[in-house]
Each structure stands twice: as structure tokens, then as C-alpha cells.
Amino acid sequence: MDYLKVSSNGELHIVGMNTNSIRKITKDGKIVKVAGRGYQGYSGDGGPATKAMLKSPLAIAFDSKNNMYITDMGNNRIRKVDAKGIISTFAGSGNFGWAQDGETVEIYLHKFP
């Protein structure tokens, strides 16, 4: 199953849960990889998102600065790709579970965020 989202600059982004990647269709019709290497895993924080590994990404969202947030479901994390294409972990430690009141979001991220 794929998830589609349009960014603020009008580009259509495609979340490939089975391809472990995020691609976009540019305004001139080209398909460009944005994040993920195409096979599952966890790596890449601090480097180019196109060289990072994702595991079953589910959905994406954009903030006002056009940073992209990826629900990296298989890794129990939310990953952030900044406007320069650098990926980082925004939330989650990779542990499955529920956070209790007062705990930080980095401790747990539910399996299906």
C-alpha cells in the first residue's frame, strides 16, 4: 500500500511501505527518491536521507518550513528530513510500547504511530 501527500511546493510524495522509501513526482514529471535505500533497516541519522534505511514507512507530513516527517513504523520512530535532505530521528527510541504520563516521547513510540 502506498500513501500520497502533496508538499507545500506542489510536489506529490509517495510513501512506499513495501519499498521502504519515499519518492516524489516533481512538477516537471520526474520521479525522484527522497528517502530510503529501498530495503528495510535503520540507519542514516545525520546524513543524506537517500542513503538512510527505513522499515515500513507508513505516512508523511510537512511543517511550515517544508521539513518532512516520516512515520517509520517498523522502526518505531518518527524520522525528520530537513529542507536540505538530511535525516534524523525526531521521536522514538526504537522500543515498542506505550509511554506513561510524564515520560518523554523518545522513550516509546507505539507500533502503529
Where are the regions a protein language model picked out?
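Gly/Pro-rich loop segments of beta-rich domains
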Residues: M1-Y3, K30-S56, I86-P113
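Residue-level detector of Asp-centered blade-edge/turn motifs that repeat once per structural unit
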Residues: V6-N9, F62-K65
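Conserved beta-propeller blade signature
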Residues: E11-H13, N67-I70
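Short loop/turn segments immediately following the C-termini of beta-strands
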Residues: M17, M73
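A short loop-to-beta-strand structural motif that recurs across blades of beta-propeller domains
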Residues: N20-K24, K30, N76-K80, I86
